[in-house]
């Protein structure tokens, strides 16, 4: 070994009691926070994605598919009006 930086080795860290006391609380907390973020619908609001029941409205039941090569801007305008 050429030199030491004075840092603890990874094996020392993960075998310490303090590591597991801290991480036994933080790791499950992250999973619970993520589950709440998605299950409450906050993820839809934050990222602006439509909720599962908002993909197709009563007036628009078809898929917004661009079919024309040269009139694509007009088709996009039609699709944006239906939102």
Swiss-Prot record:
GO terms for cellular component: chloroplast thylakoid membrane; photosystem II reaction center. Gene3D superfamilies: Photosystem II cytochrome b559, alpha subunit. It is a single-pass membrane protein. SUPFAM superfamilies: Cytochrome b559 subunits (SSF161045). The keyword Lyase does not apply. InterPro entries: PSII_cyt_b559_asu, PSII_cyt_b559_asu_sf, PSII_cyt_b559_CS, PSII_cyt_b559_N, PSII_cytb559_asu_lum. The chain crosses the membrane at residues 21-35. Keywords: Chloroplast, Electron transport, Heme, Iron, Membrane, Metal-binding, Photosynthesis, Photosystem II, Plastid, Thylakoid, Transmembrane, Transmembrane helix, Transport. Pfam families: Cytochrom_B559, Cytochrom_B559a. It is found in: Plastid, Chloroplast thylakoid membrane. PROSITE patterns: CYTOCHROME_B559. Belongs to the PsbE/PsbF family. This b-type cytochrome is tightly associated with the reaction center of photosystem II (PSII). PSII is a light-driven water:plastoquinone oxidoreductase that uses light energy to abstract electrons from H(2)O, generating O(2) and a proton gradient subsequently used for ATP formation. It consists of a core antenna complex that captures photons, and an electron transfer chain that converts photonic excitation into a charge separation. Heterodimer of an alpha subunit and a beta subunit. PSII is composed of 1 copy each of membrane proteins PsbA, PsbB, PsbC, PsbD, PsbE, PsbF, PsbH, PsbI, PsbJ, PsbK, PsbL, PsbM, PsbT, PsbX, PsbY, PsbZ, Psb30/Ycf12, at least 3 peripheral proteins of the oxygen-evolving complex and a large number of cofactors. It forms dimeric complexes. PANTHER family: CYTOCHROME B559 SUBUNIT BETA-RELATED. This is Cytochrome b559 subunit alpha. It comes from Mesembryanthemum crystallinum.
């Amino acid at each position: 070994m050429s030199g030491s930086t004075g840092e603890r080795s990874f094996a020392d860290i993960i075998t310490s009691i303090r590591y597991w006391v801290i991480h036994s609380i933080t790791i499950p907390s992250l999973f619970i926070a993520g589950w709440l973020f998605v299950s409450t619908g906050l993820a839809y609001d934050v990222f602006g994605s439509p909720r599962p029941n908002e993909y197709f409205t009563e007036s628009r039941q078809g898929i917004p598919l661009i079919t024309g090569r040269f009139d694509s801007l007009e088709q996009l305008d039609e699709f944006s009006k239906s939102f």
